[in-house]
Amino acid sequence: MTLNSLPIFLVLISGIFCQYDYGPADDYGYDPFGPSTAVCAPECNCPLSYPTAMYCDNLKLKTIPIVPSGIKYLYLRNNMIESIEENTFDNVTDLQWLILDHNHLENSKIKGRVFSKLKNLKKLHINYNNLTEAVGPLPKTLDDLQLSHNKITKVNPGALEGLVNLTVIHLQNNQLKADSISGAFKGLNSLLYLDLSFNQLTKLPTGLPHSLLMLYFDNNQISNIPDEYFQGFKTLQYLRLSHNKLTDSGIPGNVFNITSLVELDLSFNQLKSIPTVSENLENFYLQVNKINKFPLSSFCKVVGPLTYSKITHLRLDGNNLTRADLPQEMYNCLRVAAEISLE
């Protein structure tokens, strides 16, 4: 990974654990309940130390208040907002962040091109609402789209078209099936993070961009993986497929032998054997399967001074293995392992 890509990578990593933690005190170091600027909606707060942010959280609002020009960061979390009129943001062309989590928004009540007119918008978060499909059209400046915890059943082809700067998409906890999103992410060549966990996928969608670093399919109903599905993913580092219905017969021999992969989670499936992985893999989670054998060939093709597995954490607890099942030469292959959990 280049130094230029490191900052965005660190942001993505932090987002795994703090997806919705963008509180004002943490972000900007001020008290959000202090004095407000004169140019602010009366029911909201625009802190003196950060006057381009307007906080309207937890106010039981049913409509979006008038937003003064000059506001760049707008927070409307935990309200009762049901609709957005097309002219709502006409006065705030500089808006960069629009956070609408925990409201009552529906697609039919988001009017016209209300979002696409925001030519500087970078973050759009509409988590925990009542959406049934992805919102759109959206501005090409967008880099972070979060639509998790809705009732989304489809992402229409073209809904995300032209979003060349989009790096993060959260679609977890919806009602998506593979056919309803196949091809929806085509052309998103900057996409690094895609979360499709907790949906209704029975197979993997087609047409995902090969730029991805992090790809999450956990908590679905996936039973098999097409041969060479991940072949084009040259930079994929984190892959989660836990809590699915994967069996040995549904996993082609080398499908997880991805040289860029750092972490692979296959826990809580129905595997009886350990799939072959790259020697570059560092974290491998296989707990709560039906594994009953430990072939070193799954980790090391050849063992030598410079050829060994880089795995540091290996979880095998909740399987049909004991310490006695581990081959004596295991540590020649797994020589840098700091943790091997069996029970």
UniProtKB/Swiss-Prot annotation:
GO CC annotations on file: extracellular space; fibrillar collagen trimer
Sulfotyrosine, modified sites: Y20, Y22
Disulfide-bond pairs as recorded: C300-C333
Residues in LRRNT domain copies: 31-69
Keywords: Disulfide bond, Extracellular matrix, Glycoprotein, Leucine-rich repeat, Proteoglycan, Pyrrolidone carboxylic acid, Repeat, Secreted, Signal, Sulfation
Glycan-bearing residues: N91, N130, N165, N257, N320
Signal peptide interval: 1-18
InterPro entries, per database record: Leu-rich_rpt, Leu-rich_rpt_typical-subtyp, LRR_dom_sf, LRRNT, SLRP
LRR repeats: 70-91, 94-117, 120-140, 141-162, 165-186, 190-211, 212-232, 235-255, 260-281, 282-301, 310-330
Posttranslational mods: Contains keratan sulfate.
Cell compartment(s), UniProt: Secreted, Extracellular space, Extracellular matrix
MF GO annotations: collagen binding
Predominant place of localization: secreted
Family stated for the protein in its record: Belongs to the small leucine-rich proteoglycan (SLRP) family. SLRP class II subfamily.
Complexes and interactors: Binds to laminin.
Full protein name: Lumican
Higher taxonomy: Eukaryota, Metazoa, Chordata, Craniata, Vertebrata
Gene name linked to the record: LUM
